């Protein structure tokens, strides 16, 4: 029995399912989840001491790689001065100024402790600002586990949605409309019928929770247009894409400006953090400036703020993003070439340093239905084949992969060598 198997049995005694977030349990791919003990740069080591090249990167935050020495030293120094104050610090103001200088349309920002808190608070704020209740989200997008967002589509575009988890009151579905991602026509039809009731649209500009699915040309522009026309708030959930796809997030990459942006992951440098920010007239409605309540004991945590500031400082180096783009291009193009050579139906998507791949006959994957139709059993075999060869990919076919600045040419070569062997066995 491996050490991971032993630890998983032990964990299940006191942790539901043995994990603290469902995807970690390997339910999607089968087998025992790998328990990890340490990570450095592009590598992560399991409890038995086996090293893997890591393309999960803690689900996106580690754009500089694991345990970057400058970030680690900054965290140690900050921790020596106190782990939490529950009071204002200069550091949170400095990070707020930095975010507002980099993110399009962000005049003010409020820090929280997770992406879920950020999206939940952004929706509450949008509802208060517009004095409306209905929200639009998209099938396949994930915005955390708050009740209003755990709603899946009904039987038709404008039918009521239904909760996607027990414990979510059905009445919340009355206010949540779930549409097809990348379907601009459907969005326009929905607004034509219900526009005066819609408080906001919330969307992942690049969907990282049905693998990696970019917006088709004109889709984000359509969202901006209908929100402007009907007085609704456009919320871009950049928890995953913020400082991951470009130095100014997906908004800078695609030239779209949100009314409210949610952030997380990279802005904490690996520490727990989230944020939501946007137009001054909207953000000033948050307490204590305005009537919309939001609070948190650990919001603006000084250690997390220090890690975030150092990470963003390092990301300003001009060579960072071109390097990330080149490495990501090399990986996905290499995978496509190898799959084609092996005669495996396969296609890839990537934006910046996010990437995804699909076992499908489709030439381009742009929506949730296509993702659901992919060959998941074949993905699972590929995942385990790569894992055996020391390559750690996301343990689910619906999750994006991530490149870091720490990945080397040797890492890419080793990954493609492993992929060639696995493709030949499928």
Curated annotation (Swiss-Prot):
Name recorded for this polypeptide: Glutamate-1-semialdehyde 2,1-aminomutase
GO terms of biological process kind: protoporphyrinogen IX biosynthetic process
Subunit structure: Homodimer.
EC number per UniProt: 5.4.3.8
Pathway: Porphyrin-containing compound metabolism; protoporphyrin-IX biosynthesis; 5-aminolevulinate from L-glutamyl-tRNA(Glu): step 2/2
Keyword Phosphoprotein: no
Pfam family, one: Aminotran_3
Keywords: Cytoplasm, Isomerase, Porphyrin biosynthesis, Pyridoxal phosphate
Gene: hemL
Needed co-factor(s): pyridoxal 5'-phosphate
Keyword Cytoplasm: yes
Molecular function terms, GO-annotated: glutamate-1-semialdehyde 2,1-aminomutase activity; pyridoxal phosphate binding; transaminase activity
Catalytic activity as recorded in UniProt: (S)-4-amino-5-oxopentanoate = 5-aminolevulinate
GO CC list: cytoplasm
HAMAP family from the UniProt entry: HemL_aminotrans_3
InterPro entries from the UniProt entry: 4pyrrol_synth_GluAld_NH2Trfase, Aminotrans_3, Aminotrans_3_PPA_site, PyrdxlP-dep_Trfase, PyrdxlP-dep_Trfase_major, PyrdxlP-dep_Trfase_small
Coiled-coil residues: none
């Amino acid at each position: 029995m491996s050490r991971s198997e032993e630890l998983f049995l032990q964990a299940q005694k006191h942790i539901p399912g043995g994990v603290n977030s469902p995807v970690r349990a390997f339910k999607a791919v089968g087998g025992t989840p790998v328990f990890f003990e340490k990570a450095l740069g592009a590598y992560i080591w399991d409890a038995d001491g086996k090293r893997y090249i890591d393309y999960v990167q803690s689900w996106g935050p580690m754009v500089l790689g694991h345990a970057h020495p400058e970030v680690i030293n900054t965290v140690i120094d900050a921790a020596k001065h106190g782990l939490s104050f529950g009071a204002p610090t200069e550091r949170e103001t400095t990070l707020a100024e930095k975010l507002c200088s980099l993110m399009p349309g962000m005049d003010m920002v409020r820090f929280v402790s997770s992406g879920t808190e950020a999206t939940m608070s952004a929706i509450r704020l949008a509802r208060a600002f517009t004095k409306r209740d209905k929200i639009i989200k998209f099938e396949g997008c994930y915005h955390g586990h708050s009740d209003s967002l755990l709603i899946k589509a009904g039987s038709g575009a404008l039918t009521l949605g239904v909760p996607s988890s027990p414990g979510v009151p059905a009445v919340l579905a009355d206010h949540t409309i779930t549409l097809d991602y990348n379907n601009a026509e459907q969005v326009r039809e929905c607004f034509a019928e219900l526009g005066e009731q819609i408080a906001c649209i919330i969307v992942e500009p690049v969907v990282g929770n049905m693998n990696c699915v970019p917006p088709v040309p004109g889709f984000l522009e359509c969202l901006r247009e209908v929100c402007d026309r009907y007085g609704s708030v456009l919320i871009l959930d950049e928890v995953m894409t913020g400082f991951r796809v470009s130095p100014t997030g997906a908004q800078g990459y695609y030239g779209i400006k949100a009314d409210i942006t949610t952030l997380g992951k990279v802005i904490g440098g690996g520490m727990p953090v989230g944020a939501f920010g946007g137009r001054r007239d909207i953000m000033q409605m948050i307490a204590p400036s305005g009537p919309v309540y939001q609070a948190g004991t650990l919001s603006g945590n000084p250690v997390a703020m220090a890690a975030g500031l150092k990470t963003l400082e390092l990301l300003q180096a001009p060579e960072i993003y071109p390097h990330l783009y080149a490495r990501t291009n090399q990986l996905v193009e290499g995978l496509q070439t190898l799959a084609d050579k092996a005669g495996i139906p396969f296609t890839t998507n990537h934006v910046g340093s996010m990437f995804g791949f699909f076992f499908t006959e489709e030439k381009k994957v742009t929506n949730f239905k296509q993702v659901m139709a992919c060959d998941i059993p074949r993905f699972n075999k590929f995942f385990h084949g790569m894992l055996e060869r020391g390559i750690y990919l996301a343990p689910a076919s619906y999750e994006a992969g991530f490149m870091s600045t720490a990945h080397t040419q040797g890492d890419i070569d080793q990954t493609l060598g492993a992929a060639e062997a696995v493709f030949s066995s499928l």
